[in-house]
Structures are given as C-alpha cells and as structure tokens.
C-alpha cells in the first residue's frame, strides 16, 4: 500500500474513532447526570474515565493525526501534543484503579461501605488523580525529552545561527525519549496499576464466592452479593479491554528501546495499528456499559429516544392546547 494511501486510511479510521469516542462517552456522562439511579461513587469514577475518553476523541486523536504527519513546528508545541495523550491515558488508568478499590470495599466491608465511600470523597479522589495524571504526563517538560537530538526542519546553518527559531519534525519519537516511555511511563505508571487491579479483582471474586457459600446468608444479602459480582465482572472486562488495547503500543516501545536496530526498520503499519487499537479503547467502554448494565442501557435508550430521535406523541389537553410526551419502549 503506498504511503499516501496508508496515511489516508489511518486518518480516516482515527476520525471515525474520534466520533465514536465523543458520542459514546458524552452519552455516559449525560446518563449519570440525568439518572439518580446512576449517581453513585462508582459511576463518578466511570464519568472521570468517560471524560478522559471524550478528551481523547476531541484532542488526543487530532493531535496524534497531526503528529503522524510529521509537520514542522517548535519543539515545545510538539512536546505538548505528544504529552497530552499521556495525561489522558494516565487518568484513565487511575480511574480504573479507583473503581477497582471501590468495588473491593463494597464486597469486603459492605456494612461500612456507604460511610467510607461518599460522593464528596469520590470527587476529591478524582480531582487528586487528575492532578497526578497531569504531573506524570507532563514530566518530559521538566527535561526528560529529546530536544538536543530532535531532527529539525531548517538548514543546519540556520539552526546554528538561531537555535530558538529552529523548527523540528513533529513526530512522537522525535520529542519523547523511549527511556521515558518504557521505564517511567510503562514500567512505573501503567504496569503496576494494571497488576494491582488484577490482584484486586481476583480478591473480589474470592471474597464474594466465600460469602455466597455461607448457608446462613440471607436471601437479600445473597442477591446483593450476586449483583456485586456481576458489576465486578463488567468492570474487570473493562480493565481487560484496556490492557489488550494498550499493551501492543507499549510492546512496540519496549522493542524500540531494547532493539535499536529494529526501531529503525519497524513498519509504519504496525505503529499505526497499535495506535489505532489504543484509541479504540476510548470508544469501547460505553458499549460495555450498555451491554452489561441495565440502568445504563435504560438511560441510554431514554436519552436517545427523547433528545436525539425526538420520539414524542401528541396529546390534546383541553381546547386547542397541544402537548407532547416522550414514548419509551424498552425490551429489557
């Protein structure tokens, strides 16, 4: 496939993912905002995740497309474009980790859960996690970057005359060192939370199964536990999808760092596919919610019917007065 055609396909797929990410995750935020049944601390963390995914669609994907074309710009502008997606990725990981801890507390200490995990505390944790995500994602601005070796777009003489005016080719690997991406970002900030989440969900299932085996458990308590297990399965599925979507791009980064010769000849289609897969993760979560959660499914249908499809039937109320009422038909 010619390079131009390959780039065109990549850009088209990225734009499609951006549209799906924004649409689906705005729907998630709207669902939690309009449904009292969905306004729980757990779902506040999912809204944080959805907000990160909306930002991926609105900003990170356009930035990624821009960077993939290798246009010329000043170093720090390019570095910001490259780092912004790292902020959103880190925020997503922290949101998933917070959800895992939240679900563990719900199963481990059900009687104290409501007093421990309140809406105010959840919002405070979310704010702290976003601040931490920005700190981690923007670390290259503190000096861990490739400014000194970045390939520039100007003539060598021009760069030597006025370094501040030197434009560089805006490519991710031209501004962010692989040592940062592998040692700090992947080994330090991505892999540990994923492993912690794996341990937490294993513990959730073990604790819940032990409690379900207790013969003296009341029917109501058994129903609550079964519901918690179902929720944990859904959230574990989201974590699994996140890992599957993001591990390929991190694997390529590791190969680029540890096998420098391969880094010079790695196929562009492999890089683009890995990047597309990582961005596809932002479009998948709303589908999981709709498939696995009855309340989300109901609220999605309600919002789409009322505000998008405008399904209303006319009601005559009194003389000459016309009213409208939304109609919902849910097959749940």
From Swiss-Prot:
Receptor for adenosine. The activity of this receptor is mediated by G proteins which activate adenylyl cyclase. Its main location: membrane. GO terms for biological process: adenylate cyclase-activating G protein-coupled receptor signaling pathway; vasodilation. Disulfide bonds join 78-170. Keywords: Cell membrane, Disulfide bond, G-protein coupled receptor, Glycoprotein, Lipoprotein, Membrane, Palmitate, Receptor, Transducer, Transmembrane, Transmembrane helix. Pfam families: 7tm_1. Glycans are attached at residues 152, 162. The keyword Endoplasmic reticulum does not apply. Residues 1-8, 68-78, 145-177, 259-266 are extracellular. It comes from the Eukaryota. It is a multi-pass membrane protein. A lipid is attached at residue 310 (S-palmitoyl cysteine). It is found in: Cell membrane. This is Adenosine receptor A2b. Belongs to the G-protein coupled receptor 1 family. PROSITE patterns: G_PROTEIN_RECEP_F1_1, G_PROTEIN_RECEP_F1_2. GO terms for cellular component: plasma membrane. Residues 34-43, 102-121, 203-234, 291-332 are cytoplasmic. GO terms for molecular function: G protein-coupled adenosine receptor activity; G protein-coupled receptor activity. Adenosine binds at residues 173, 253, 278-279. The chain crosses the membrane at residues 9-33, 44-67, 79-101, 122-144, 178-202, 235-258, 267-290. InterPro entries: Adeno_A2B_rcpt, Adenosn_rcpt, GPCR_Rhodpsn, GPCR_Rhodpsn_7TM.
């Amino acid at each position: 496939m010619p390079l131009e055609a390959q780039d065109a396909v990549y850009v088209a797929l990225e734009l499609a993912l951006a549209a799906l990410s924004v649409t689906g995750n705005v729907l998630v935020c709207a669902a939690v905002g309009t449904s009292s049944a969905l306004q729980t601390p757990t779902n506040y963390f999912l809204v944080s995740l959805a907000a990160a995914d909306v930002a991926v669609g609105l900003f990170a994907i356009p930035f990624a497309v821009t960077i993939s074309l290798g246009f010329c710009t000043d170093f720090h502008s390019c570095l910001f474009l490259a780092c912004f997606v790292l902020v959103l990725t880190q925020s997503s990981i922290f949101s998933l980790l917070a959800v895992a801890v939240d679900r563990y507390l719900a199963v481990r200490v059900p009687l104290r859960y409501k007093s421990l995990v309140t809406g105010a505390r959840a919002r405070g944790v979310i704010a702290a996690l976003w601040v931490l995500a920005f700190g981690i994602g923007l670390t290259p601005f503190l000096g861990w970057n490739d400014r000194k070796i970045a390939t520039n777009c100007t003539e060598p003489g021009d760069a030597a005359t006025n370094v501040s005016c030197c434009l560089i080719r805006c490519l991710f690997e031209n501004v962010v060192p692989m040592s940062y991406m592998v040692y700090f970002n992947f080994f330090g900030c991505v892999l540990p939370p994923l492993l912690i989440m794996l341990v937490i969900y294993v513990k959730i299932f073990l604790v819940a199964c032990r409690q379900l085996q207790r013969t003296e458990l009341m029917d109501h308590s058994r129903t609550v536990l079964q519901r918690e297990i179902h929720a944990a399965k859904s959230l574990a599925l989201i974590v699994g999808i996140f890992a599957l979507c993001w591990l390929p791009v991190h694997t390529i980064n590791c190969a680029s760092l540890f096998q420098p010769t391969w880094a010079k000849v790695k196929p562009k289609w492999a890089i683009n596919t890995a990047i597309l897969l990582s961005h596809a993760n932002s479009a998948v979560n709303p589908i999981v919610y709709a498939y696995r959660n009855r309340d989300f499914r109901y609220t999605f249908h309600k919002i789409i019917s009322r505000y998008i499809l405008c399904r209303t039937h006319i009601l005559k109320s009194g003389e000459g007065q016309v009213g409208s009422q939304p109609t919902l038909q849910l097959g749940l």
